[in-house]
Structures are given as C-alpha cells and as structure tokens.
C-alpha cells in the first residue's frame, strides 16, 4: 500500500506570499526612495509656516498648529485665481491635441521606419533632429525662423507680417507646433524598438494570409506593441499638470503671455519667483496635483486594459 504524505498546511500559501513579496520589493523600494524620500520634506512643508532664515515651524505665532491652513489657501487659489483656470485649460487642451494628432502620427511614422519604407529614412532624419541636437539650439533656430524669418516672407508675399511669439492669438499654436515637431524622437525610439521585437514568423504568417501593408499594422503590429503604447499613454496622463511645454525655454520666467501658460509652467514660475514664505503653499499645490493625477492615471490604465487587442 502506497502512502502519500500530505503537504504541511499553509506551505503553498507561504510560498505564494514569499513569491509575491519578492515581486513587490523592487517597485515598493523605488516608490519609497523616489517619491516618499524625495518628497518627504515637501509633504512636511504643507503643515508648516515660514519663520525666517530658511526655517519653518509647525506652529503659528499664537502657538497653535498650522494644520491644513496651507491646503485651504491652495484650494482657494485654485478656484479663484485666473492663472490656475487658464493653466488647467491649456494643459488639458495641449494634452488632447497631442492625443488626437501626435499619437497617431507617432505610430504611423514608427511603422514606416520599422518597415524600412522609402519615406522612412527622410522622416527619421527630420523628426530625430530635435532629439540629437541640444534643445536650446533647436528652440533658437525655430524661434528665429518663426519670429524673424517668417514675418519677412509673409510681408514679401502677402504684404502682412506678425510676430508669432509676441502675439497671444498665435503664440499658443506656435508653441504647440514646436512641441509637435520635437516630441517625435523618444516616442519613435520606443515604438520602433517594440516593433523590432515582433517575431518574424508572426509577420510571415500574416503575409501568407494576404494581409496588406496597413492591414499588417492594424491587425499585427499595433496589437503586439500595445503594452508599449499603454505605457506611453499612462505616462503622458501622469505628466499632464507637470509639463510646462517648453514655455520656459521660449519665454523665461516672466515673459510668457498670460493666456498661454500651463499648470507646469505656472508652478515652475511661482517656485522661482516667490519667496521662501510661499513654499508651504507650493507644496500643497504639488500634493493636490498628485491627488488629481493618480485617479486619472488609474482610469486611463483601466480604459486601456479594456481596449487591449491582446486581451479581447
């Protein structure tokens, strides 16, 4: 008679728990170091006030706790300061403009480069140029052409001229066009690398089934690189309110037209222009932006998971 020894109760569960813990150690350590560690002092500043000589206190002059007063000030400013409403509007507008224009073109250009199409070489040179050269060099060239060269051409051809960066009505679209051009490099690099990892056997099988050039992109390439696409989209959502969209590079701290500022630029501007006594309120702004961004990122992740071609 053969007897089978029973495993000790809970052994498998313990092994599973240890395995899960090992998987979570690195991301949790990264979160603790690069978020909690880096922002620990900023979080503490929310509950303090400036007392002079770069010193802060948790107590008011009357001896009571500062508490949530900085958060209250931050919330009041968010709903009663025009710069905040303009910043939110522009940040969201730039994000959605990039989503409906830049994202599809990123994918298509990456696909042309991946398939080694004739136009792919030209696109690679033109769109990689801003990533290869210094950002300040490309900005100076772009600004000189748009603000100095283009008005001369328009005056010669149509008898009219304008300064794209000084005119508030055209500055926004001019900044967007620069971001549109300069933003291809990193995304194309990620997409082409992901496409290059697709197995040749999968591509050959699709060709044997008679798939067309663009049919291969829709039915094979895009579903296979969807994890990369999802990662880029979630990263973009997280950075909506932190991105200053090169406004500082074009205008510095004070010269940007009020109608084109973004949340990221306004926060950067206030951090550099306001005194140390304003740091607690700025820290409160940062916490609020985090509280807003995290649910947006989770919603984006959930929505992208639902439309994942590999899951359906």
Predicted feature residues:
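A structural signal for multi-pass alpha-helical bundles of membrane permease subunits
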Residues: 8, 12-312
């Amino acid at each position: 008679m053969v007897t089978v020894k029973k495993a000790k109760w809970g052994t498998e569960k313990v092994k599973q728990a240890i395995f899960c813990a090992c998987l979570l150690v690195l991301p949790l350590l990264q979160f603790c170091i690069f978020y909690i560690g880096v922002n620990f002092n900023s979080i503490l500043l929310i509950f303090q006030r400036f007392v002079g000589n770069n010193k802060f206190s948790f107590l008011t002059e009357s001896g009571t706790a500062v508490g949530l007063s900085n958060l209250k000030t931050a919330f009041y400013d968010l709903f009663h300061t025009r710069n905040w409403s303009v910043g939110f509007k522009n940040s969201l507008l730039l994000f959605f403009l990039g989503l409906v224009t830049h994202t599809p073109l990123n994918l298509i250009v990456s696909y042309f480069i991946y398939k080694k199409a004739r136009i792919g070489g030209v696109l690679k040179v033109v769109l990689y140029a801003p990533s290869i050269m210094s950002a300040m060099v490309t900005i100076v060239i772009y600004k000189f052409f748009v603000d100095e060269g283009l008005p001369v051409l328009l005056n010669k051809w149509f008898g009219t001229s304008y300064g794209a960066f000084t005119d508030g009505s055209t500055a926004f679209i001019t900044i967007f066009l620069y971001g549109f051009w300069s933003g291809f490099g990193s995304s194309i690099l990620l997409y082409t690398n992901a496409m290059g990892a697709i197995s040749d056997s999968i591509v050959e099988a699709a060709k044997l089934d008679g798939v067309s050039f663009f049919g291969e992109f829709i039915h094979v390439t895009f579903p296979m690189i969807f994890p990369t696409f999802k990662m880029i989209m979630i990263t973009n959502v997280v950075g909506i309110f932190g991105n200053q969209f090169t406004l500082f590079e074009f205008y510095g701290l004070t010269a940007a037209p009020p109608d084109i500022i973004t949340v990221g630029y306004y926060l950067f501007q206030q951090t550099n222009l306001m005194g140390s006594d304003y740091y607690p309120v700025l820290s409160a702004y940062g916490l609020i932006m985090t509280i807003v961004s995290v649910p947006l990122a989770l919603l984006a992740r959930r929505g992208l998971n639902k439309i994942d071609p590999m899951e359906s």
